Amino acid sequence: MFQQRIKNTPIHRQRRRAKRVLSKLQKQKNWYPNFAIIANERISLSIVVEGFFEAEELDFFIKWINYQGFELQGTAIDIGANIGNHSVFFARYFEQVLSFEPNPVSYYFLKYNSSLEENIETYNVGISDSNKNSFLKIPDNDIGGCGAYISNHGGTPIQLVKLDDFLETKYPITLIKIDIEGYELNALRGMNKVLEFHKPMILFEQLENEFQKNGKNNVIEYLSALGYTKFAYIENENTTKYSRKQGYFSKKIHSLKRDLGLLKIKMFVTDKDCIPARYHTFIIAIHKDNVKKYRDL
């Protein structure tokens, strides 16, 4: 009993966590790319430890796709590519990756990081519902632009294009990932022809404040009108945050599971009205012509 108590002291828990971090770093050395990163930014710090930003979610996404028996081929499009984290990851599974990033600082790093793979093409433009010049507001403490947003009232000059007008690819489009800080609906309105012809999976981030009080979400409603009738979302117990209402013991049990490596990631496929109104690392929209292929994991 005494020995068991010693093993559960804070110092031993810290050692177990340190071993997990070292194991991840060794895996990164053996498999993950040597990214050029922007120091002290959230995405960069995660890449240093995990090898990729959102590595667990991306790995699980590929596992889920394979579980469906879906072939990873054709073109993946990365809209809001930032420094290239998702682009480089997708390049290892798809025949071609097209990366779009309007922020000139992020694009500088994207251009270098994309050279790590031979099948990535990069474009220093943003995707919108019209072809025009605009501005990008970049926070002073976030030069990489994770919190940047498009503005009509000054900022860094950028070019916006409609994907329908810009795109030329010899491969079928299998996946479109969109992460552009609340500008997703504008981007989708400029790619109706692409979505109608290719019917790709659409992977997009959603913030809690993008859900209305009645649970409705403008992006999800728009995609539903285009024939996207099923949506998959991730439940990652490793990133669950407990409020005070959930109690002391819930937090302790969650902490113990994390230390023992027992936390799980799950993927749920549901209707548009059943998606929890909270922050989502990504939601996957599935076209009705492909629905029969997908299931929970």
Predicted features by range, described:
Residues 207-209, 236:
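Active-site beta-loop-alpha junctions enriched in small/polar residues
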Residues 1-113, 117-119, 152-156, 166-171, ...:
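S-adenosyl-L-methionine
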Residues 89, 93, 187-194, 218-222:
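A short acidic, amphipathic alpha-helical/loop segment
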Residues 94, 227-228:
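Short, well-ordered alpha-helix to beta-strand connector turns
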Residues 199-206:
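Conserved beta-strand signature within the Rossmann-like core of class I S-adenosyl-L-methionine
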Residues 49-77, 133-135, 142-198, 210-215:
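Short internal loop-to-helix segment that lines adenine-nucleotide cofactor pockets
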Residues 104-142:
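Core alpha/beta nucleotide-donor-binding catalytic domains of modification enzymes
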